[in-house]
Amino acid sequence: MAHKKAGGSSRNGRDSAGRRLGVKKFGGESVIPGNIIIRQRGTKWHPGRNVGIGKDHTIFAKSEGVVEFRNGKNGRSFVSVVVPAEMPAKAAD
């Protein structure tokens, strides 16, 4: 007797969209409060001065300034926002 198995369905063919993680504002870029600096899983980068960290480990700016990346102790990388010194107002001509 010739038999042919019923055609099954493939168990492959599914994938999820990328999560768009990574650095969003690089060192030297200007930021304002609320700007997302890094989206990450876990704490690859740790928060430094003038930045906060969300429950999903997103690092965001808390004040206006310039992004700075630096290496700390124990191999940790820190992200800070450096607030520029207040510039004196230019005198009108």
Curated annotation (Swiss-Prot):
One of its GO terms (molecular function) is structural constituent of ribosome. Coiled coil: none annotated. It holds the Pfam family Ribosomal_L27. GO terms for cellular component: cytosolic large ribosomal subunit. Keywords: Ribonucleoprotein, Ribosomal protein. The keyword Transcription does not apply. GO terms for biological process: translation. Residues 1-22 are annotated as: Disordered. Belongs to the bacterial ribosomal protein bL27 family. This is Large ribosomal subunit protein bL27. It comes from Parvibaculum lavamentivorans (strain DS-1 / DSM 13023 / NCIMB 13966). The gene is rpmA.
